[in-house]
Each structure stands twice: as C-alpha cells, then as structure tokens.
C-alpha cells in the first residue's frame, strides 16, 4: 500500500510541475507580446503638404503673409540670400529634393527641410521644436541640419572662408590707416563654445577655466565684422597662446604665399602686416598689443586706440552668436566633427550676410532665450592640454 501511495504522490508532483511550467510559459509569452506592442512605431500624419503650403504662403509667395523685414528678422538673412542658398544646396545634395516614399506618399519639400535647419541654427532650438510649424520629424530635422551645414561648407567655403586677396589686403590696409593703424589686417582673439554632451572620458581634456567642457574658436575679424580666419576644434583646456602655436593663421606667411602688404610708418618701409591682440599673445612682429600700465599721454592714447580697434573681433563674436544662437548656447551634438561643421557653416553664412548687407544699416539685436547662457570670449590663461583630433 505504501508503494501505491508513493507512486500516486510522484504522479501528482509531475502534474504540478507540468502545470507550473505551462503557467510560466504563458506569462513569458504575454510579456513578449506586451513588449512588442510597446515597441511598435507610432505613425503620425503630419499633413506635410499643408505645412509646405502654409510656409510658402507665409514667406515665399508673391504676396506673402509676412513682409520682407519679418523674414529678415526670423531667418536672420534676407529672402534673396536664403533663396540663393536654397537653390545651391538643393543642386548640391539631392537629399533636399522632394521625393515620394515607398508607399507613394509625397515627402517633405526642400523649403521645409532647409527652413527647419535654419531655424535650429538661428534659434538654437531642439529638433522637436520645429515640428509643429514645419511639420518635420525630429530625426529628419537632425539629418537635415547635418547635411545642410556640410553642403554650405562644400559650396561656399572656398569663397567665404578665403584668405585675403590682393584687393582685400589693399582695402584692409586703407581701413587700418584711416583708424591710425597702418598695416593692420584685423584683430585676433578666441572664443569658447560649451559642449554639453561631451563624453565623460573626454571632459577633463575639454575643461579649462570655464569649469565645463568647451571647444575653442580662434578668429581674425576686420571692422566690417568679416571673419577672415577661423580655426576651431581644440579642447577648452588650451589658452589663446596654445591655440596660436597650433593655428594656421600665419601658414601662408611662413610659406611665402601671403599677399603683398606694403606700407610706410615714420619713413620706414614695411612689407608684412599685423593683427591687434590682447596681452596673452607673444611679442611677435605680426602682433601688436596694448601698452599695460601706460604712462604719458602718448602711451595712454595708443593703448586706448588699440583696445578700441581690437574689439572688432569681439563684436564679430557677438554678432555671430546673435545671428546663430546655436553657437551661443551649449552644443548638444555628440560628435566633434558635427560641431565643427556647424561652427564653420555659421561663420560662412555670417560672412555672406556681411557681404549682402554691407551697405545697409540694420539692427542686429535679436530676441534671445534667457535660458541660453552667454558664451564669453577667452582672456584667462589656463593649463596646457593635449590635442584630440576629430
């Protein structure tokens, strides 16, 4: 009798085990099906055609809803210059050409993609912020920005980031002579751009006196705010002097390919121009600095005039940040190469605006987002750091 009871107990245990395994399997299947449901992509009908028609009627129609000065204020550039950039970018990169998708639906127009890119550059807005008006998704906005800035560099970089030609040098020399600095070709300084999404492993290298990761821009600008030289990409642990030693600003002069620069001061002939700089820069013949703790009227007057003219590059930094708020606030992209493309493209378009509005007196004061911190030019000496190439 004991053997029969033990066998029945074994059968019962097997039954319970099979039932338990079945319950566990059903729960796992339920979890899998639930997770699949949560991962399904939500398709939004953004009514792209209506978005394009509204955008076209607002700004690009023969009789637009908003006049030209509204366009200039909101896009940071004139409509004629925008259309010039638009046509060149569409011709250069077929990504911006309107196409149909696999389902036969008409995609975004070139105006929508380029407008989204310009709004992100001009306002420093997130990719999702332009969706409700332009009717463009976040991932498409990010891709449009990356392709747009790369197209700007490839199309206009050679012309609008060129070294001064003979005609440019003659005009700069005349301009400097009128300001009391014969031989001056511009002023040089550095600016830091905060990198919000700097990888943790790199933060020590990119952190300097700002106490947060930054990337340095070295620039040379003239009185009309044209940026003649831009060197971007060194970590923020460097100072202006470290950047200068790695910069190609004097590369053409060292190779003997610089444009001729002849002028006379106190009956002495000179054939090499110079830049105005602040006190951290070295005592080179191509750099003219102020006189610290100046004594006497002559020295005080020279220091005052030098410090006044040297602010051209700081004004250029301020106008660049006003026109393109994306370089005023912290950089949110992950790759240094993308940040470099954005900075370079903004400088190119800044120079295009300077050329387009050279004879116009326009207000460059734009409404800023108070939540975006101000990026100040660098004037403090910091520790040396290693260089990280893109």
Language-model-detected regions and their locations in the chain:
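Short, conserved non-catalytic motifs in the polymerase core
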Residues: 97-108, 297-302
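Short, amphipathic alpha-helical "recognition" segments used to contact nucleic acids or chromatin
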Residues: 110-122
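Short basic-aromatic helix/loop recognition motifs at nucleic-acid
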Residues: 73-76, 101-108, 118, 232
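Structural recognition of short helix-loop-helix hairpins that underlie histone-fold modules
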Residues: 86-103, 124-126, 321-331
């Amino acid at each position: 009798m004991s053997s029969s009871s033990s066998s029945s107990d074994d059968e019962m245990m097997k039954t319970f085990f099979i039932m338990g395994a079945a319950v566990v399997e059903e729960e796992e299947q339920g979890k899998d099906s639930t997770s699949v449901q949560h991962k399904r992509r939500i398709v939004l009908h953004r009514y792209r055609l209506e978005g394009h028609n509204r955008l076209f009627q607002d700004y690009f129609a023969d009789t637009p809803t908003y006049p030209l000065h509204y366009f200039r204020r909101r896009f940071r550039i004139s409509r004629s210059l925008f259309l010039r950039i638009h046509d060149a970018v569409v011709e250069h990169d077929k990504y911006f050409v309107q196409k149909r998708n696999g389902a036969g639906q008409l995609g975004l127009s070139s105006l929508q993609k380029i407008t989204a890119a310009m709004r992100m550059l001009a306002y420093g807005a997130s990719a999702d912020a332009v969706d409700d008006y332009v009717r463009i998704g976040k991932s498409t906005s990010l891709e449009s920005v990356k392709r747009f800035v790369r197209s700007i560099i490839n199309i206009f970089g050679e012309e609008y980031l060129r070294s001064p030609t003979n005609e440019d040098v003659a005009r700069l020399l005349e301009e400097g002579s009128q300001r009391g600095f014969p031989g001056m070709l511009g002023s040089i300084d550095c600016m830091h751009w905060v990198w919000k999404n700097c990888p943790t492993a790199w933060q020590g290298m990119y952190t300097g006196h700002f106490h947060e990761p930054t990337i340095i821009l070295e620039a040379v600008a003239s009185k009309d705010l044209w940026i003649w030289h831009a060197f971007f990409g060194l970590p923020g642990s460097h100072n202006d002097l470290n950047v200068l030693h790695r910069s190609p600003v004097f590369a053409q002069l060292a190779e003997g390919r610089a444009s001729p620069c002849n002028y006379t001061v106190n009956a002495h002939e000179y054939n090499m121009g110079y830049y105005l700089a602040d006190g951290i820069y070295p005592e080179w013949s191509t750099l003219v600095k102020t006189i610290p703790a100046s004594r006497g009227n002559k020295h005080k007057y020279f220091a005052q005039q030098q410090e006044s003219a040297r602010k051209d590059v700081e004004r250029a930094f301020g106008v660049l940040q006003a026109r393109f708020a994306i370089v005023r606030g912290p950089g949110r992209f992950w790759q240094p190469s993308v940040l470099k493309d954005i900075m370079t493209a903004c400088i190119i378009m800044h120079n295009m605006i300077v050329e387009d509005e050279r004879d116009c007196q326009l207000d460059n004061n734009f409404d800023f987002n108070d939540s975006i911190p101000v990026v100040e030019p660098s004037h403090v000496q910091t520790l040396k750091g290693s260089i990280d190439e893109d």
